[in-house]
Amino acid sequence: MENIAIVTVAYNRVKSLSRLLNSLLCADIDNAPLIISIDKSNTNEVERYANDFIWPYGEKKVITHKENLGLRKHILSIGQLLDYYDAVIVLEDDIIVAPGFYKFAVAATKFYCNDNNIAGISLYNYPFNYQTFEPFDALKSEYDVYFMQIAMSWGQVWMRDSWRRFYNWYEQTKHNKLACINNIYCFKEWGEKSWLKYHIAYCIDQNKYFVYPYSSYSTNCADKGTHVTTNLFVFQSPLKWSKQENTYRFPTFPNRSEERRVGKECRS
């Protein structure tokens, strides 16, 4: 489980992409491929910046789509990269990351990659409930992470097998626009450009969970874009900036199981 790529998702916001890529340059990374996926827009400024960007930690690949996919199709197309990688760390261009994000992502992926209960790994920790705008503070445990039945779009890891299970479900469900899925009333109202509502619905319908850190390794700058009409600051979460040792306390699922420290290989 060492074949993990960092994938940045861009459209027409060169300043946002620059901010994200500069945060990646400050991260604790030994060697990792970087893929910059750019949807078709009315400017080639983003493509020029991406092509000129120097990535010192390994291979860099720029994907430029010849037609406009739109946010939903663009994000879902990233899953195709899992034909070539064991996992991908997906970062939209309005995200920035903490220095330890990659070490955490790799360790969590190694630990949870064979757990069928897990649909993905979040780098972000919610400071509030974004449906009610009320404060949210997950009940602390002796571990570094917790489980929540909410998919993540503000910095997340997709693993090959869990993503394929989701995408097979998505292909069978997308045509009815979630009409047959109960208990997701607040997400059904999201527009058809949203891919996230399908991943959330999948977690609820199939009883899957995302792994969340108690301290964020990513934050959302919420720049003006497809789902944000003006720049926002409410989605920013404090980043875990202190140096993290390369050992994490991950609980097996469910929480009552014994603690297990991440090893070199995925569980068999």
Predicted regions and their residues:
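Peripheral/terminal regions associated with large enzymatic or DNA-binding modules
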Residues: M1-L91, I95-K264, S268
